[in-house]
Amino acid sequence: MSRFWLDKVAGLEPYVPGEQPASDTLIKLNTNEHALPPADAVLTALREITGEQLRRYPDPTAERLRSAIAAAESVSPAQIFVGNGSDEVLAHLWFAFLKGQRVQTLDTTYGFYPVWAALYDADLTEVPVLDDFSVDLEALKNDDAAVVLANPNAPTGRALPRDEIVALVESNRDRLVVIDEAYFGFGAETAVPLVAGYDNLVVTRSLSKSHGLAGLRVGYAIAQAELIEGLNRVKDSFNSYPLDAVAQSAATAAIEDRQWLEAASQSVRDVREVMKTGLEAMGFEVLPSQANFIFIQHNTLPGKHIFDALRSRDILVRRWDKQRIKNWLRVSVGTMAQAEQLLVVMRDIVSAETI
């Protein structure tokens, strides 16, 4: 600890990302990367990057990318904000609109929310999810506080239907409602069509999960133009060039390839169902998921035992020590071959403990 640290820095509890091992022999089901490589159009765009593009600064407005997103979502480019992953987009959002404000989120959700709340001095209330990990919607209907809600939620995978999002936004008309759709495209209804009617709604997204671009770091927000203008003011007060030319070109190609997105998302849904069916047959409870992962616990075996046993067999999943979910594991949806290998290993683990 340096003597130059501010008290704020000393008191931070930073977010801890999932493990990224160097080995390529592991079956990596712990950080929810897409199971498939990105679209061929993305790889073509990367190959076509020129030295001149790298010599010059990138477009600070990312106009081509924003226009592609706007066309895909039937909104105006003025309603699109882009950043270096949805984490940066959300961080700017907290700074622009939630700093020092009362904010509600869930007690079992994305671990970065309390980090940003502490960083930006927000008064955070963590509303408990219900016994089945569904959202207590009535508890969030509070016009005294903004709401930040992951939908689908992580790590549970559960999602609210659009009509319940409408009810939430309607009941919090004088406070901002942020719907974090990092896991869009895998079955949940999107809140994007609601943006036109609500000046208190922001929808954020990542290309890491849906488009297989976790290594590229691209995210965006959709909201009415006045909110987007506020985000741009904050962005340009930190870094006018958050997205480099390579990221802008590749992300644009990804957004424009709707056929790849639909086919890849269906593949995830198909493998997810195979994993769910196979694990339930072994005595696992598997929560309903609208994401590219499942949240599971066994009816007799402790979560840490399963986690350690999987790791000893070169399969990584995600586990937390938090009391409420310590026996639960979050398992990313992999390829069909990875899913089949997971089921074989899980069967061995369960069988060894029941002999």
Task: Label the model's feature ranges.
Residues 134-143, 155-177, 181-213, 225-227:
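Active-site pre-lysine segment of PLP-dependent enzymes
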Residues 63-102, 120, 300:
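Phosphate-binding glycine-rich loop
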Residues 200-280, 284-287:
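PLP-dependent aminotransferase class I/II
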Residues 1-56, 143:
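N-terminal "arm"/small-domain region of PLP-dependent enzymes with the aminotransferase-like
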Residues 76-80, 101-102, 181, 199-200, ...:
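Short acidic capping loops at alpha-helix termini that bridge into adjacent secondary structure
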Residues 163, 309-313, 318, 322-355:
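PLP-dependent enzyme catalytic core of the Aspartate aminotransferase-like
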Residues 96-150:
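PLP-dependent aminotransferase-like
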Residues 268-269, 280-313, 329:
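Conserved PLP-binding catalytic core of the aspartate aminotransferase-like
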